[in-house]
Amino acid sequence: MSQRKRYSLNVVTSPSIPSPTPSAPIRTNESNWEAASPASAASSFLPNVHHGGTVLNPGLGIMRSPSLNKSGAFGRSGSSGSSTVIEPSNIKLLLIGDANVGKTAMILSYCRELLTRAEMSRSARLRHQQQQQHKDLGLKKTVVNHRLSMKEKRKRYSSNDFEKEFKDINHFADETSDFGNPNIGDDNNHEMADPNEIVIETRSTIGIDIKTNLVNIDNRFFNVILWDTAGQERYQNAIIPSLYKKTNAVILTYDITNAKSFQSCMERWIVQALENFSSQDLLKARFFLVGNKIDLYKERQVTHYDVVQMVQEMQLKHGIKISGNFEVSCKWVNVVERTMNMIILDLVENGCFENNDPCVSITTSDDVQGHEQEFHDTVEEPFNFTRQRQHQLEKNNTVDITKPNDDIANNQSICCV
């Protein structure tokens, strides 16, 4: 055997040249999260399922924060440089109402899980390209297999057999070319539709569906938990006991094109909520009224006067104050998002959330107004900062013989001058 030279895979380097090391650790800030997030390029709230990395309504002070780990805990660095893991505070939103009023679509729109027509068109074209590649690959395999079979049976084939095989191949090509074409079945109305309009394709909720979203309000994290309930009566008995426990906001949802769903909020859903709320949970709960499908305003059956009248009836009959009433459309971008942000800010300002940070005390807007009133009461009386300087009277050393001497009363001896 001939001897072969063996080569080493290790590269020889000079010991005087150290290997390059980074001078400082690489830090990732929110701008990098936004640039790396695919949601910021495809949306005007986010494409993430539950968490995102873009700013929501900077005027409201709410920002969606990217998840740093699976548990959802975030680290806050102190002045000493050490970081402590603090769980975000929980805010539970419960959406109740009749079936087909759009509760599921509202939650998916807030979590940005609904696609627009432009995004649907891009995904359909991508799907069509992939199917076209599979089709071309399938045709090549079919032609190769056909040629192999022809070589094996060429002495048995006639002209009629060749014509039949040729027709079968053309029929297969026509079927695969039509499959997955995004232009087939589209109407002219779809071509004239708004590309930014959201396409709603949801199904009826069975039981309960829960979505979570992490938001940042003034550098404090809140875990927003949205509970989607079924509107059918057959699912109510199983979910009522644990439905209203630790609920911070009850969102009464109705369809503006369906007057019956609006009346159900007064006759059924608000009564059910008051019967199942505990006295302790009711103190930290607020009620909101949200009308959906305002894009169908021409078919409106619920007017603004009806809404104001129902709010007054709820307060007189049940003693419940409606903290806000809104009208939204899940087909319009950012409408549901702004409404949910206003509800969340109202809950935070009034201390209606589960505080998981023991170092932070809950201060509501009522407490702030009370402190301001006490301050104004104390300031009503003006302070007198003028000080009068009093001079100490010095005792005169001279003696007036015409007046009695005070030292005699003190049993002190005196001498006549």
From Swiss-Prot:
Function, in words: Involved in the positive control of both endoplasmic reticulum (ER) and mitochondrion inheritance during cell divison. Required for the MYO2-dependent retention of newly inherited mitochondria at the bud tip in developing daughter cells.
Q: Which molecular function terms from Gene Ontology are attached?
A: GTP binding; GTPase activity; myosin V binding
Its domain of life reads: Eukaryota
Pfam families from the xrefs? Ras
Q: What is this protein called?
A: GTP-binding protein YPT11
* Gene Ontology CC: cellular bud neck; cellular bud tip; endomembrane system; endoplasmic reticulum; endoplasmic reticulum membrane; Golgi apparatus; incipient cellular bud site; mitochondrion
Question: Where, per UniProt, does this protein localize?
Answer: Endoplasmic reticulum membrane; Bud tip; Bud neck
State the annotated membrane topology for this chain: Lipid-anchor
Record-stated family: Belongs to the small GTPase superfamily. Rab family.
Query: Could you tell me which InterPro entries the record lists for this protein?
Result: P-loop_NTPase, Rab, Small_GTP-bd, Small_GTPase
The record's section on PROSITE patterns has: RAB
In which residues is GTP bound?
97-104, 228-232, 292-295
Give the SMART domains listed for this entry: RAB, RAS, RHO
- Name the predominant localization: endoplasmic reticulum
Miscellaneous information on this protein: Present with 2850 molecules/cell in log phase SD medium.
Q: How does it assemble?
A: Interacts with MYO2 (via C-terminal tail domain). Interacts with YIF1, YIP3, YIP4 and YIP5.
NCBIfam families to which the protein is assigned, alphabetical: small_GTP
Residue positions of S-geranylgeranyl cysteine lipidation?
Answer: 415-416
GO biological process annotation, one example: intracellular protein transport
Note down the stretches annotated as region Disordered: 1-34
What broad taxonomic lineage does this protein's source fall under? Answer: Eukaryota, Fungi, Dikarya, Ascomycota, Saccharomycotina
Changing residue 102 to D has the effect of: Impairs interaction with MYO2
Recite the UniProt keywords alphabetically. Answer: Endoplasmic reticulum, GTP-binding, Lipoprotein, Membrane, Nucleotide-binding, Prenylation
